[in-house]
Structure formats: C-alpha cells, structure tokens
Amino acid sequence: MRVTELYGKKRPVVSMEFFPPRDDSAAAKFDGIVDKLADRTPDYMTVTFGAGGSNRDGSYQTVKKLVKEKELPSVAYIAGYGLGPDEITTVLDNYKELGVETIFVIRGDKPRDENFAPHPESFDYASDMIGFIKDRYDFTLGCAGYPEGHLEAESLDKDI
C-alpha cells in the first residue's frame, strides 16, 4: 500500500500511529487494541522507531504483526540519527521483505543516554537519508520538517 494513492481520493484519510509495545503485558494489550481499532477500518497504521534505533526490533516486530498477522496496511518509520548506512539498509531490507511500500523518514531525536555514540557515518539530516534511500529502493517516502526551523539549526535561512 502506497500512502500517496489514498490522498488522491475525495474523502478523509484516517491513520493510526503506534509505539511498539515494550514488554509482554503491553504486547497482549496491543493485540486487543489493534483488533478493536481495525474494526474502524483505518486507511493505514504507522509504527514509530526509537531514538538511535533503540527499539528497532520492536518496531519491526510490530510492523510485521500488523502486516502479516492482522493484514493491515502499514507505514514504517525510520529514524536514522545514530545509524550507519549498513544498519539503515538492514532495516529497510527487512521492511521490503515484509511488503511494506511506504516509509516515513525522520532524523529522529538524539538518545538521552549520555554514553550514546552515533555511527561515524550517521545521517545528520533526514534529507540526506531520503537521498540515500531513493538511490537504493522504490519505497514511497514521507517525511516531517520544522517550518519554523529546527531547534538545532544555526538559522532559519541555513535550515531551509
């Protein structure tokens, strides 16, 4: 499912966003919630991705559950800050194998862990990661930005 196909229709598009469950108890609740929400026939579900890839397996498992078990159209996030090109490629290869066609690309927040060290080839900007992905994959890509300028930007002019 490519999200862009939905927005050409003359009706509201409804999506629901999920954070990957953090433990078995949350996973059990997640299943019940997804089943109830699926009855509302959302157009697609999105699944977030932890800072610095901190919960990337949880994100993958959640997307896998939505796509393979629940048969729900899903969009996977990828937050590339801290990840190297090989790690991003692995994540995207896994999503491609699941049949995911739309990826939501964000730089992502810096992890709160003061000992966190980003990969030396980490992407500092989502726009750089989008170029990397477009050169290698046929995903439909979405992204988010800061119209007022990013908090870490030197100036709005340089940010734009």
Regions found by a protein language model. Name each.
Residues 41-81:
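Active-site cofactor/substrate anionic-group-binding motifs, chiefly glycine-
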